[in-house]
């Protein structure tokens, strides 16, 4: 009788563990399909003390993110710099020119992640290389992630210093008219399975 009780207890624990593992697997979603129409990459900077806003309308991406294994996450984004939208077609044309983004020579800005660190409370640090105009810089980007079933939303913001990438050459390389700090804000929506 004692042996049967031990066996039943052992079997019960195995079944409980199996059901917990199955439940965990059922709720584990890997997010990999970015939804560009539900996503945005925007920026804000100061020009002569006045806040100016803009965004990029087109980008491509590759993403692999499992909330249960964030350290294995990978992400890369290629932003079409000529898709800049400042609300002024004249300003957009100037920003695409040689002193600024020089989109004929450097059509895209690229970010490639190198590591993802979970901080708790749906907060993460995403480290990687950001390349603009052929100049690569190591960056660490704080981000949050929130899931709603098979849809996940990544949000974050960071400061880009345009001087590090020669955005604004010649007379524009000084920061008295256009500030060096550019606040980049993103919202990336992705689906998974």
Describe the function of each predicted region.
Residues 1-6:
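Short, Lys/Arg-enriched N-terminal segments with co-localized hydrophobic residues
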């Amino acid at each position: 009788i004692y042996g049967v009780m031990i066996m039943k207890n052992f079997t019960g624990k195995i079944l409980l563990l199996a059901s917990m593992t199955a439940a965990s697997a059922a709720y584990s979603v890997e997010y990999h399909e970015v939804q560009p129409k539900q996503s945005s990459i925007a920026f804000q900077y100061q020009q002569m003390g006045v806040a100016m806003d803009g965004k990029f309308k087109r980008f491509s991406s590759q993403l692999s993110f499992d909330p249960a294994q964030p350290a294995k996450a990978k992400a890369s984004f290629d932003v079409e710099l000529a898709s800049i939208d400042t609300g002024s077609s004249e300003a957009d044309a100037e920003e695409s020119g040689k002193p600024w983004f020089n989109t004929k020579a450097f059509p895209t800005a690229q970010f490639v992640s190198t590591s993802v660190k979970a901080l708790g409370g749906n907060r993460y640090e995403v480290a990687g290389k950001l390349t603009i105009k052929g100049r690569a810089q190591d960056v660490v980007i704080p981000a949050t992630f929130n899931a709603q079933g098979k849809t996940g939303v990544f949000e974050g913001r960071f400061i880009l210093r345009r001087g590090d990438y020669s955005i604004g050459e010649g007379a524009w390389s000084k920061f008295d008219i256009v500030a060096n700090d550019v606040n980049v804000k993103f919202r990336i929506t992705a689906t998974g399975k």
